[in-house]
From Swiss-Prot:
Keywords: PQQ biosynthesis. There is a cross-link at residues 15-19 (Pyrroloquinoline quinone (Glu-Tyr)). This is Coenzyme PQQ synthesis protein A. Required for coenzyme pyrroloquinoline quinone (PQQ) biosynthesis. PQQ is probably formed by cross-linking a specific glutamate to a specific tyrosine residue and excising these residues from the peptide. GO terms for biological process: pyrroloquinoline quinone biosynthetic process. The gene is pqqA. The keyword Oxidoreductase does not apply. InterPro entries: PQQ_synth_PqqA. It holds the Pfam family PqqA. Pathway: Cofactor biosynthesis; pyrroloquinoline quinone biosynthesis. Belongs to the PqqA family.
Amino acid sequence: MWTKPAYTDLRIGFEVTMYFANR
């Protein structure tokens, strides 16, 4: 199973990536 901290960090990283990609 995924650990919550790792999952959250991955999600945040994905959010940031999408944010910069949309710029």
